[in-house]
Amino acid sequence: MIRFLFFLLISLNFINASSNKRYGAGLDIGSKGSGIFFNYLSGNVEKNFDLVGEIRYFDIIGDTESIVYDYWTNQYVTISGQNLLFIPMLVGFNYHPFVGKIANNFSPFITFRGGLNFSIDGKEGNGSYKETWRKADTQWSTAGFIGGGIEFRWYNQSSIALHIGSDIIKLKKKADQKTNYSGLLIHISFNRFIID
């Protein structure tokens, strides 16, 4: 934990010193669940390396979870659901190997991120919101993401990035009978450049 905080402080110092800064938000769609995220990117002047800080809110779906229509109540209902949330906090980098070699602001990249995950395991069942989350089990574990993607930069100081890769989340103790929640993740990011 102390090493991660030290790395984060060094990373923030690098972020503030660079000139190619942007922030964004987006959607995560994965084999284990879905969610939203917020990120902050700081790149070098050559635009081939970005340091990334990111926080996510990820709702984990159960292996047998499905949504059915209840004709009696005229509502959609989740059956066999689980109440498990992940909040990963990651720091990493994007490397753009083809900067200046491809026209039209199209930039493929590879990415690596690592950090901590805070998991909240709520009580299962059909209780109220308060009953579900009142005495939820929590734990910290390591998390990471390895993948590739494409960033489209536009002249109006914004960009869209599509990442596809492997989310690596292994818990220290079981949450809903599992410790390994790694899997495929599609990460869609909408970014805005910060003009100094």
Task: Please give the residue ranges for each predicted region.
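Extracellular loop and loop/strand-boundary signature of outer-membrane beta-barrel proteins
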Residues: Y23-G26, N74-G81, K130-A136, L171-K178
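Gram-negative (and chloroplast) outer-membrane scaffold detector with strong preference
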Residues: G43-Y129
